[in-house]
């Protein structure tokens, strides 16, 4: 059986859905509450183990990293654990969570853990520390391990572009603290597709009585496409049908803006760290295993930006007025 943690989140949910479409696999999903996080999943013909906080649910096991006692039952009978990292907290909290997962997986007799880590290009970012610590902790464990070093999500620049689209349509300016740097990004769905392939192949290898072909492997899943501030401005120009220029802003200006955004202090620190690395030119990938493991061509971030902006209905004032007067 395969269990995927964090299925109420974006990546975990995509992985769980993908595995649930694989023939001949037993798949269980885990959430903090064990409630209705996976309502509507298509899992015909598969064994899907359910559980809730009260133990009488039908859709997901309760997996709460902040409640280590819940993990022993949650991991019961699991062969392959897809361990989606839980990084939305201060480092000490993340280390405690991840350590509890490793301990519980060993105690439950899990045979193979697949961990979603951070790509090498991000090793100087503040978010890298808990990932590298977890990799080291997993290396000392009794089960086999596969590390999926995920690149930064394409959804980050897509979200920035979408948030800036209205202003860019009015002013013709996209402002961001990217400097002259570019960042390699990868669509979350592409990362999920790789995780599905790896976890499914591991489960099938184990079912045939052999050690998995992925045991002991670390895969760099860096994006094949790098994007910078000028690139985003150019895509906005196409999507908005008006010229948009890129205006770099300082990290100090960005930090001040984030201070009033409602983000937690650790989130601000991680954001500034990402932008600092981007400015320094450290976030462009040199090598990637993505194209080897992905069954299709990687999704293009430029296409995602255009789609998001068009779906948002953003257009420059001149385009909107032209549409009204011509009936287009």
Language-model segments: what does each one mean?
Residues 75, 79-82, 114:
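N-terminal Rossmann-like NAD(P) cofactor-binding module of classical short-chain dehydrogenase/reductase
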Residues 1-28, 32, 36-39, 66-69, ...:
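Oxidoreductase cofactor-interface core, primarily capturing Rossmann-like NAD(P)-dependent enzymes
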